[in-house]
């Protein structure tokens, strides 16, 4: 060992392992407006104090490692380290705590959701001192959110492009999701759009398979859109799924969609990845395409109550990365979604400023400044009897998407679309007249069905269909 090395190693450096809480648990810390704040649900291993567990999360997701290293002396840890500044027990849960961690903004690359998640959740979830760990919420400071483009267009620009105001938009996922030829697929799209829907949709796993290559699907769907527009006088769209095995192929598909003149493309943002999603969002902004986002794989990450990442965090990340629509559960359909939690992250998607509200799972006040909003999409196991509840829960700025609830109509796809459009228009009119959709919803649908045989047939088919299971993720 050289004398120079000995001198550096001996000044202020003591090798060995020390408790994380000595450095990273700082209960007196006053958070800054520029800090990224995180709320983690921490379940420590037996014998691990909550302060040590919270400090370990702060350390391992910022500057720390398992032992003291001499290169700590070459930088300012006080400037760059994450800090666990508050810990509170979770009411009604044994050995679970909410650990609040503050991260200095300089730890993160500007405009990169990928880098943000790599730091905050990239490594710490496998930490042995923790039995389980869940990221419940993030506070994104305005100084960081302003480094993101966000949604390609946002809610108001989309309404202006479509010339549709004062009601939710209606969609339909084409079924069967796999196996149709491109021509038959386009036929189903046309029938749904001419029946009164605003959009139809590729399912999340429709990419470019042997039974239907992407280019053929794009062409037949574009033909269906133009034919339906000519017949109805309304602007129509189909979410053409541009998700692909490489970013280059994804952009190539988006370019072809733009050349066809269609209004919207689609991406599976979790399986495709945030880097790919942000790239596609930038392309869509530059080329006038709307971007629909599917959240395929989300339940792998967010469904367990004590481990993973809550969807409200994934929703915030999507708003930063970019998307004009995102699937957000239904509350009333076949997929997971507790009402207050769902409404909490719906507000985080749409609104500019959202106050802290623990009753809805919102741990921090979030100010998005001028970042455009995202339309929540209600999809999964919904039908005409759900229309009053969906209209009341989600309001006008939403997309209500009926797959089986359109294509399962006994008279075919177009009558299924008519039934949904009539039900929606009836609910919107009743709401505008001051009627209570939650209390009078079934009566409103029955009244509309008297003059719409398509709606009457749909009401008869789905009158007994319910998906009543308790939500796994509750407050």
Curated annotation (Swiss-Prot):
Q: What is this protein identified as? A: Ribulose bisphosphate carboxylase large chain
Residue positions of the PTM N6,N6,N6-trimethyllysine?
Answer: 14
Task: Spell out the subcellular localization from the entry.
Answer: Plastid, Chloroplast
- Complex and partners: Heterohexadecamer of 8 large chains and 8 small chains; disulfide-linked. The disulfide link is formed within the large subunit homodimers.
- Residue ranges annotated as propeptide are 1-2
Is Metal-binding one of the keywords? yes
Q: What is its main location?
A: plastid
The residues that hold substrate are 123, 173, 177, 295, 327, 379
**What domain of life does the native source organism fall in?**
Eukaryota
The keyword Plastid is annotated on this UniProt entry: yes
**Member of which family?**
Belongs to the RuBisCO large chain family. Type I subfamily.
Which BP terms in the Gene Ontology apply to this protein?
A: photorespiration; reductive pentose-phosphate cycle
List the catalysed reactions.
2 (2R)-3-phosphoglycerate + 2 H(+) = D-ribulose 1,5-bisphosphate + CO2 + H2O; D-ribulose 1,5-bisphosphate + O2 = 2-phosphoglycolate + (2R)-3-phosphoglycerate + 2 H(+)
Query: Which molecular function terms from Gene Ontology are attached?
Result: magnesium ion binding; monooxygenase activity; ribulose-bisphosphate carboxylase activity
Task: Identify the catalytic residues.
Answer: 175, 294
Modified positions (N6-carboxylysine) in chain numbering: 201
Q: Which HAMAP family match?
A: RuBisCO_L_type1
Q: Which residues carry this modification: N-acetylproline?
A: 3
What is the additional note?
The basic functional RuBisCO is composed of a large chain homodimer in a 'head-to-tail' conformation. In form I RuBisCO this homodimer is arranged in a barrel-like tetramer with the small subunits forming a tetrameric 'cap' on each end of the 'barrel'.
Q: Which cofactor does it need?
A: Mg(2+)
Q: What is its EC number?
A: 4.1.1.39
